[in-house]
């Protein structure tokens, strides 16, 4: 069974025309079991558009969305979130942005994601439909980030065996159990901070670059 990857997309800079187009696209979504099939965004009944059956085929989803399946769970005028198989729907997001930038070439968008373990987490920022910057961290890098902010937890980690410390019988020590619980409690706070910092810095860079090179009429 595929690992679920949760994702969340924010349109940080988006004009009214692009918002209106996004609203049109989301009107194609049909709720099924409290969620929406990602590919239905493009099922609008117009000539040349895919059908409901087509966007559910493996070849279409992997070519246009990325993951073999992907669901949207919630959306509004400037964000949406959901989950997918094995990876985030980066291709699907670019496909959305290629449409929205027709109405707002200065649209700025971010996506954050993590798999359910998490084995990896990441973020990307897009200027228009072009990826400006991003980062993906694996479980070891996540652990190092947590330990850097909570050095007392590192004392109970066994680097040689890549696990929490155990006693002579191979059982986790009481101190290691407590450290693991604390680690789990603060892990997503550290992850969210890493992602937010990266996104904020990238958006600041994009805006400063645009101020230095204003758009030409």
Tell where the protein language model's regions lie, with residue ranges.
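Surface-exposed, low-hydrophobicity interaction/linker segments
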Residues: 23-59
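Short, extreme N-terminal segment that most often corresponds to the first beta-strand
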Residues: 1-35, 211-217
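Charged interaction segments
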Residues: 47-217
């Amino acid at each position: 069974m595929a690992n679920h990857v949760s994702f969340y997309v924010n349109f940080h800079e988006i004009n009214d025309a692009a918002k209106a187009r996004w609203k049109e696209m989301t009107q194609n979504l049909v709720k099924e079991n409290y969620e929406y099939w990602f590919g239905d965004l493009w099922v609008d009944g117009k000539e040349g558009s895919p059908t409901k059956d087509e966007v559910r085929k493996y070849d279409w989803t992997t070519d246009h969305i990325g993951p073999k399946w992907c669901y949207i769970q919630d959306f509004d005028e400037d964000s949406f979130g959901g989950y997918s198989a094995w990876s985030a729907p980066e291709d699907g997001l670019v496909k959305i942005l290629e449409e929205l930038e027709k109405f707002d070439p200065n649209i700025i968008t971010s996506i954050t994601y993590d798999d359910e373990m998490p084995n990896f987490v990441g973020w990307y920022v897009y200027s228009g439909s072009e990826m400006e910057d991003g980062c993906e961290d694996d479980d070891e890098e996540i652990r190092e980030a947590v330990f850097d902010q909570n050095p007392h937890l590192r004392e109970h980690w066994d680097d040689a065996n890549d696990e929490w410390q155990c006693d002579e019988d191979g059982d986790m020590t009481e101190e290691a159990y407590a450290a693991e619980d604390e680690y789990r409690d603060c892990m997503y706070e550290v992850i969210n901070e890493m992602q937010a910092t990266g996104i904020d810095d990238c958006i600041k860079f994009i805006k400063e670059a645009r101020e230095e090179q204003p758009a030409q009429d």
